């Protein structure tokens, strides 16, 4: 075995050494079966690497159990696989569930596996390169890193177990694939977290319209979720989403908000949120060690974090009409020909007082039957110039006959439609 024969690159200038970053790792536990994930390996010698498992996950549990039994943990590392297998491996499945079963569901057929020759664990049959290895029962005792992380930041020095590579096999003219941080990794993480959040909200009985694992949240910590809301769903959605994986901050909005438009999301927060009512903070939740905002923790201790949810949906008890969107006058009906060589380009007819008075009575007759917005009045009497309609409406106001209904439509002062002054 000579790992130096592989073109394992450096990703950033402060990396601790060449890193295997895109290996799909399969491990076998005698009780829980197969677990699959993506972990990085810093090359230390021609047949020795580290394995970065500082975060609490199923692979870490497998390694810990093997350490307690003072036995090596057999693993395979499949490099150069289909993206579907990378997606599946990145999913944080329940203990005892093999992530390759999830990949098979995405693919629509079972993922093809093959048996290793030197360890009792399978590997991905379509891989370009396969490493057969063991995680030695040394514990988290060896320095490893640093490494440019998915956070867009340089990580610190980690303490990790040691991996001994026992065999290397590859295809003829094999292609070595390296996952570069943060962008490739970021886009691979987003779909798995999207699916996990959607499932959690489905279990909570919340109807989801869409989910955006935001790029600014490195598609890992931040989610913006639009829902078809029923009473109480905003808070229920927050609680469900914050329970997923390492999600840290969640914004829930109504289904009229585009979760992929940051201006709309910010607008929803600005116009629909009262901080004392709509912001939820959960302290001492399990955190991820790579979060640079966390205080340093002792070696081997999993950090805790604060999770924040913002319910930016329209609250129960708030009148829906407060959120009626602006519709611009004539935006859908205006034509350039109305203004160039058309009616608006001609000299306006000077309406006499007699014409204005007659028009005012016609408008009053209509408003006696039904309230109308000003633009509807102007449209109904479009044979008159707009200015004439405005003057006729003004005349009704001068005569103290004009009023408005609760929606702001024009009506007659003494009609059943007229708004009443609040007490």
Where are these regions (language model features)?
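Residues in well-ordered beta-strands of folded domains
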Residues: 26, 42, 52, 76-80, ...
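Minor-groove-contacting beta-hairpin "wing" of winged helix-turn-helix DNA-binding domains
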Residues: 408-415
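Short, well-ordered strand-loop elements centered on a beta-strand within folded domains, enriched
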Residues: 33-39, 51, 162-165, 178, ...
């Amino acid at each position: 075995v000579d790992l130096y024969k592989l073109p394992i690159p450096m990703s950033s200038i402060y990396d601790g050494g060449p890193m295997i970053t895109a290996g799909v790792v399969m491990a076998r536990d005698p009780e829980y079966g197969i677990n699959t994930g993506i972990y990085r390996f810093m090359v230390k010698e021609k047949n020795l690497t580290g394995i970065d498992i500082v975060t609490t996950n199923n692979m870490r549990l497998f390694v810990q159990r093997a350490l307690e039994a003072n036995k090596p943990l057999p693993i395979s590392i499949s490099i150069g696989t289909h993206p579907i297998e990378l997606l599946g491996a990145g999913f944080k499945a329940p203990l005892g569930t093999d992530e390759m079963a999830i990949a098979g569901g995405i693919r629509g057929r079972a993922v093809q596996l093959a048996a290793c020759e030197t360890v009792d664990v399978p590997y991905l049959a379509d891989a370009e390169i396969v490493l057969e290895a063991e995680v030695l029962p040394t514990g988290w005792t060896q320095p490893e890193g640093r490494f440019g992380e998915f956070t867009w930041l340089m990580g610190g020095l980690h303490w990790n177990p040691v991996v001994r590579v026992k065999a290397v096999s590859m295809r003829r003219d094999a292609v070595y694939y390296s996952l570069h941080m943060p962008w490739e990794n970021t886009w691979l993480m987003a779909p798995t977290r999207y699916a996990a959040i959607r499932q959690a909200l489905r279990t909570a009985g919340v109807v989801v319209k869409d989910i955006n694992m935001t790029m600014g949240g490195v598609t890992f910590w931040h989610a913006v979720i639009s829902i078809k809301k029923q009473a109480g769903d905003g808070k229920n959605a927050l609680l469900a989403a914050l329970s997923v994986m390492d999600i840290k901050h969640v914004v829930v909005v109504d289904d009229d908000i585009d979760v992929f438009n940051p201006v709309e999301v910010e607008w929803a927060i600005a116009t629909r949120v009262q901080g004392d009512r709509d912001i939820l903070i959960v302290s001492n939740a399990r955190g991820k060690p790579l979060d640079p905002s966390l205080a340093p923790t002792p070696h081997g201790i999993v950090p805790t974090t604060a999770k924040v949810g913002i319910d930016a949906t329209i609250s129960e008890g708030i009148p829906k009409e407060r959120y009626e969107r602006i519709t611009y006058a004539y935006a859908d009906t205006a034509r350039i020909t109305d203004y160039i060589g058309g009616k608006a380009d001609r000299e306006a007819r000077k309406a006499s007082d007699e014409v204005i008075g007659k028009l005012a009575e016609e408008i009053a007759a209509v408003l006696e039957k039904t309230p109308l917005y000003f633009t509807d009045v102007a449209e109904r009497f479009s044979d008159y110039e707009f200015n004439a309609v405005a003057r006729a409406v003004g005349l009704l106001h001068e005569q103290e006959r004009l009023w408005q209904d609760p929606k702001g439509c024009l009506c007659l002062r003494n009609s059943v439609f007229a708004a009443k002054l609040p007490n």
